[in-house]
């Protein structure tokens, strides 16, 4: 049963010969275009392909191409950015379409014969000591995987498809799952897809995975990495095989690892292709609200034009800050969710009493006299004072007051946008209906 299931999955995700030939042809053509532009520029630049296509760990139909323009180390960073973008843009002009995108430094994203191509300037590094920009390691990652994969390419494909199926794939900040490189490392380390699943509990308890023995080779640097990641409470620490300063699993959240933890156990107990290819989780968020008897507060806003890596963590911080303030104001917040341009807050009630009763100090103390002077309605309960104060009752009024005063923890780039947010109760724009359902039904991280 287990072997048959894996065979069936592999047949649908492994690229056929015709697809492989087409991918190779496209990459060869892109290399030719890039080299023509480089020759015309007179620069010494090497064209290198990185990522799953270069490593042959890609899934059928997943054809995003990463083409790196590797500059000599002698080039200053500023020149790398300016000249790199100039050459990348010249290549982009020879494709069907292109646009300039921004990460640590600008790069070009284009389309060539239906294939998405990222053209990224970087340094032509040989080891971790030469790394100057975040993207430089990608060359080393590709070289390490090619050297160590030893025919386990299909095992990596199975793990990637499994992680996609359980919604735990992708290390982007809005997902915080397993990266493709992390999946490759785990298969190389443990030997197969099934063995990685069997180690789900072991990895969590061992905590540290060190494929290249950096803790022995570079103990001071590697231990610094381990201590930093433990302090940040990461689920697992996978010391990058090509750089002891980095945890490959740094972006992996406890929630996404939890999905892997339970779904691995489920698959080993009851193998099924459905974990690889699940049915869409669709439903009506309004029905969920009626069933639960709770309320959904939605804030929608226009975020600044910055990349998700900057925006999403700041929206997360703001959502948590607003939830804390609502709790302090007497509203019970049952959960939060967020995206680039929205925040969801599930609350138990949207109305609270319109008065606040506050217990005060002993009436015959200095603090008691201050309490008496400060409040309008004051009475005695035994030796202590108490006061009554009018307050806003409706959650929208309370939230608007919190936003207006700015007394909440927020990301600096998004605070102004969120202060002017639209606040909606028990209804969301059509574009957010599915997100609202997944959030309210707990399907997003549901394991039972």
From Swiss-Prot:
Subunit structure: Homodimer.
Family: Belongs to the tRNA nucleotidyltransferase/poly(A) polymerase family. Archaeal CCA-adding enzyme subfamily.
Binding, Mg(2+): 64, 66, 118
Cofactor(s), by name: Mg(2+)
GO molecular function: ATP binding; CCA tRNA nucleotidyltransferase activity; magnesium ion binding; tRNA binding
Encoding gene (name): cca
Note: A single active site specifically recognizes both ATP and CTP and is responsible for their addition.
One BP term from GO: RNA repair
Function of the protein: Catalyzes the addition and repair of the essential 3'-terminal CCA sequence in tRNAs without using a nucleic acid template. Adds these three nucleotides in the order of C, C, and A to the tRNA nucleotide-73, using CTP and ATP as substrates and producing inorganic pyrophosphate. tRNA 3'-terminal CCA addition is required both for tRNA processing and repair. Also involved in tRNA surveillance by mediating tandem CCA addition to generate a CCACCA at the 3' terminus of unstable tRNAs. While stable tRNAs receive only 3'-terminal CCA, unstable tRNAs are marked with CCACCA and rapidly degraded.
Pfam families registered for this protein in UniProt: CAA_C, NTP_transf_2, tRNA_NucTransf2
tRNA processing listed as a keyword: yes
Cited NCBIfam families: cca_archaeal (TIGR03671)
Record keywords, A-Z: ATP-binding, Magnesium, Metal-binding, Nucleotide-binding, Nucleotidyltransferase, RNA repair, RNA-binding, Transferase, tRNA processing
Catalytic activity: a tRNA precursor + 2 CTP + ATP = a tRNA with a 3' CCA end + 3 diphosphate; a tRNA with a 3' CCA end + 2 CTP + ATP = a tRNA with a 3' CCACCA end + 3 diphosphate
Residues bound to ATP: 52, 55, 141, 160, 169
EC numbers on record: 2.7.7.72
Name of this protein: CCA-adding enzyme
Chain sites annotated for binding CTP: 52, 55, 141, 160, 169
């Amino acid at each position: 049963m287990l072997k048959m299931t894996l065979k069936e999955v592999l047949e649908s995700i492994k690229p056929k010969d015709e697809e492989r030939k087409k991918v190779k042809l496209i990459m060869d053509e892109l290399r030719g275009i890039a080299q023509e532009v480089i020759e015309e520029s007179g620069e010494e630049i090497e064209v290198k392909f990185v990522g799953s296509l270069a490593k042959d760990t890609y899934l059928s139909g997943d054809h995003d191409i990463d083409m790196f323009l590797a500059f000599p180390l002698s080039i200053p960073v500023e020149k790398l950015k300016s000249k790199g973008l100039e050459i990348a843009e010249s290549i982009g002009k020879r494709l069907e379409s292109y646009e300039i995108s921004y990460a640590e430094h600008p790069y070009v994203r284009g389309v060539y014969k239906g294939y998405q191509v990222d053209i990224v300037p970087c340094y032509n590094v040989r080891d971790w000591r030469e790394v100057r920009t975040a993207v430089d390691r990608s060359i080393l990652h590709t070289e390490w995987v090619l050297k160590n994969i030893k025919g386990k390419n299909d095992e990596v494909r199975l793990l990637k498809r499994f992680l996609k199926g359980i919604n735990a794939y992708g290390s982007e900040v809005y997902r915080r799952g397993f990266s493709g490189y992390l999946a490759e490392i785990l298969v190389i380390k443990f030997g197969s897809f099934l063995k990685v699943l069997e180690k789900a509990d072991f990895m969590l308890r061992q905590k540290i995975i060190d494929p290249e023995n950096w803790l022995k080779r570079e103990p001071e640097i590697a231990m610094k990495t381990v201590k930093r990641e433990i302090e940040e409470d990461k689920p697992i620490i996978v010391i990058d095989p090509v750089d002891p300063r980095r945890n490959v699993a740094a972006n992996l959240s406890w929630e996404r690892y939890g999905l892997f933890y339970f779904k691995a156990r489920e698959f080993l107990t009851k193998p099924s292709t459905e974990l690889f290819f699940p049915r869409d989780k669709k439903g009506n968020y309004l029905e969920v609200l009626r069933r639960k008897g709770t309320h959904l507060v939605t804030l929608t806003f226009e975020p600044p034009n910055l990349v998700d890596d900057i925006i999403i963590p700041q929206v997360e911080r703001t959502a948590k800050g607003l939830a804390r303030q609502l709790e302090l104001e007497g509203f019970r917040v049952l959960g939060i969710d967020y995206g680039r341009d929205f925040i969801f807050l599930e609350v138990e009630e949207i109305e609270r009493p319109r008065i606040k009763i506050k217990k005060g100090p002993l009436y015959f103390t200095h603090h008691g006299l201050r309490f008496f002077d400060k409040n309008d309605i004051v009475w005695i309960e035994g030796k202590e004072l108490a006061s009554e104060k009018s307050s806003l009752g409706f959650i929208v009024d309370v939230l608007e007051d919190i936003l207006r005063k700015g007394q909440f923890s927020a990301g600096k780039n998004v605070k102004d946008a969120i202060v002017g947010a639209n606040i909606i109760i028990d209804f969301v724009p059509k574009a957010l209906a599915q997100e609202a359902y997944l959030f309210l039904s707990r399907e997003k991280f549901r394991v039972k």
